[in-house]
Amino acid sequence: TTEGKVIKCKAAIAWEAGKPLSVEEIEVSPPKDHEVRVKIVATGVCRTDEHAINPSFKEGVFPVILGHEGAGIVESIGQGVSKFKPGDKVIPLYMPQCGHCKFCLNPKTNLCEKISKIKTPISDQEVMSDGTSRFTCKGKPIYHFMGTSTFSEYTVVSESSLAKIDAAAPLDKVCLIGCGFSTGYGAAINTAQVEPGSTCAVFGLGGVGLSAVMGCKAAGASKIFGIDINKDKFPLAKKLGATDCLNPQDIRKPVQEIIAEMTNGGVDFAIECIGNPDVMKAAFESTTVGWGTCVIVGVAVGEQSIPFSPMQLIMGRKIKATFFGGWKSVKSVPKLVSDYMAKKFDLDALVSHTLPLDKINDAFDLMNAGKSNRTILVF
């Protein structure tokens, strides 16, 4: 047994910004009080992982083990842990749910005060609660990422950053519930609160955007526009529920004007899944005056602003944003896994590539070239 011992294993380390990740042997310490050590079985690669090593993101810390969309099996537990035992299937949660802070006790939000830097959550939780790391490589401590660090064969997480899931769940699919799927699907269901018979537009058809399309369809939308500059994304978007797909580069006028023409003045709901302020503006302007709602999902790196006029708000449009799709994580993730097992939605369609950890830089290249929806790394 490895319980109580340091584990040597492989992990992908980001040593500095703008450089490829390096797969190295690391040491993972045993879990301390209220911590759990998890053997990661599969992890998705998300745009947010790329943001964290982007030179324009000034909050990044190095060296760091990225990854926040994983699934695995509990290897051992620290003192005081009662909800988990070795062998449990689990999903690490970058959005913790402690269950007793002012946010956890309020049904209006899924935030938790354990995310201490609510200003820039993707640079948060880079050490454990005692201020130290559980990872070392070549004698150096390595930072954690978002409290999860799933680009490692073993990771250590807080017990409030972990959900126990169905023992029969396929970890190489349900890992997507750790971020991308839940974020997009929840943006439609929870944050936008898409209504039956409504019209929707989803900007950006990567893994998150395709999940938002699924959410709009599940909520009963009658028309769902999928917008992307990569037309290779359109066939899958249509399979998952998009009724119309538009490429802004093929249109002579702004896409929001085309959408307004096709919907008698604009859609009821728009969801931006890219993280580009100009696209956020287009999404907002594609909604109808009177009651249009725009939900921002994409993470914009650095000091950027959305350029729109306050007058557009006076005319009854609303702009909202979402983090982890509005799901209270510990409570909702097991239910989402059960819904997947009951075939209420199709995660398998989102997985375009499966690669070993050693090929992690290929996964980033595929994502940056727009050639993947979601790549899963299997250990």
From Swiss-Prot:
Binding sites annotated in the UniProt record for NAD(+): 204-209, 228, 233, 297-299, 374
E.C. code: 1.1.1.105
Catalytic activity, as annotated: all-trans-retinol + NAD(+) = all-trans-retinal + NADH + H(+); 9-cis-retinol + NAD(+) = 9-cis-retinal + NADH + H(+); 20-oxo-(5Z,8Z,11Z,14Z)-eicosatetraenoate + NAD(+) + H2O = (5Z,8Z,11Z,14Z)-eicosatetraenedioate + NADH + 2 H(+); 20-hydroxy-(5Z,8Z,11Z,14Z)-eicosatetraenoate + NAD(+) = 20-oxo-(5Z,8Z,11Z,14Z)-eicosatetraenoate + NADH + H(+)
Domain of life: Eukaryota
Binding positions for Zn(2+) 1 per the UniProt entry: 46, 68, 179
GO cellular component: cytosol
Positions bound to Zn(2+) 2: 98, 101, 104, 112
Compartments reported by the entry: Cytoplasm
Required co-factors: Zn(2+)
Modification N-acetylthreonine, positions: 1
Keywords: Acetylation, Cytoplasm, Lipid metabolism, Metal-binding, NAD, Oxidoreductase, Zinc
Top-level enzyme category: oxidoreductase
Record entry for activity regulation: Oxidation of 20-HETE is inhibited by low concentrations of N-heptylformamide. Oxidation of 20-HETE is a decreased by 55-65% by either all-trans-retinol or all-trans-retinoic acid. Strongly inhibited by omega-hydroxy fatty acids.
GO molecular function: alcohol dehydrogenase (NAD+) activity; all-trans-retinol dehydrogenase (NAD+) activity; S-(hydroxymethyl)glutathione dehydrogenase [NAD(P)+] activity; zinc ion binding
Gene3D superfamilies linked to this entry: Medium-chain alcohol dehydrogenases, catalytic domain (3.90.180.10), NAD(P)-binding Rossmann-like Domain (3.40.50.720)
Broad class of the protein's primary localization: cytoplasm
GO BP term, example: formaldehyde catabolic process
Cofactor annotation remark: Binds 2 Zn(2+) ions per subunit.
Pfam families assigned to the protein according to its UniProt record, in alphabetical order: ADH_N, ADH_zinc_N
Subunit structure: Homodimer.
Family assignment from sequence similarity: Belongs to the zinc-containing alcohol dehydrogenase family. Class-II subfamily.
Role this protein plays: Catalyzes the NAD-dependent oxidation of either all-trans-retinol or 9-cis-retinol. Also oxidizes long chain omega-hydroxy fatty acids, such as 20-HETE, producing both the intermediate aldehyde, 20-oxoarachidonate and the end product, a dicarboxylic acid, (5Z,8Z,11Z,14Z)-eicosatetraenedioate. Also catalyzes the reduction of benzoquinones.
Protein name: All-trans-retinol dehydrogenase [NAD(+)] ADH4
Species this protein is from: Struthio camelus (Common ostrich)
